A protein has these predicted regions:
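Histidine-anchored nucleotide/phosphate-binding helix
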Residues: 13-24
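Short, glycine-/small-residue-rich phosphate/pyrophosphate-handling segment
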Residues: 110-131
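Short hydrophobic/aromatic-enriched beta-strand-loop microsegments
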Residues: 30, 47-57, 126-129
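Short internal beta-strands
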Residues: 28-37
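Mid-chain, well-packed structural core segment of small domains
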Residues: 60-100
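Short, acidic/small-residue loops that bind anionic groups at enzyme active sites
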Residues: 95-115
Length: 131
């Protein structure tokens, strides 16, 4: 499966810890992330991550294009809901695209864990039918 990873600055350490905890599962899949998030994940896990540009420099749009082409099977986007960012409209577009294309989306740690465990069990294998 192709898994997208995005994290606001205040959630990047949480994303790193999540990827450390689920490294065994993530290592079986292709990972895609915005630039800084991807680099930070690679540093602590040694997982290979396809890195787009940094989020504010167009990485969100690159990931969004991959969602629109049905090339992402799940997106984990750890965001800071109480501190809006100037580029949040771009992220809202990514969230909307996940809804449009039936891409499972986690925006917090609890749902991220549910999605990653579902992937490991094969619960999201139905995504293969969409390709």
């Amino acid at each position: 499966m192709n898994i997208g990873l995005i994290a606001h600055d205040s959630k990047k350490a949480l994303m790193q810890n999540f990827c450390i905890a689920y490294r065994g599962i993530l290592s079986k899949h292709s990972l895609y992330a915005t630039g800084t998030t991807g680099r930070l994940i690679e540093e602590v896990t040694n997982l290979k991550v396809h890195k787009y540009l940094a989020g504010p420099l167009g990485g969100k749009q690159q990931l969004g294009a991959q969602i629109a082409q049905n090339d992402i099977d799940a997106l984990i986007f750890l965001r800071e809901p109480s501190n809006p960012k100037p580029h949040d409209p771009d992220l809202n577009d990514v969230i909307r695209m996940c809804d449009t294309y039936n891409i499972p989306l986690a925006t917090n740690l609890a749902t991220a864990e549910i999605i990653i465990l579902a992937i490991d069990r094969g619960d999201l294998d139905w995504r293969e039918l969409y390709r």
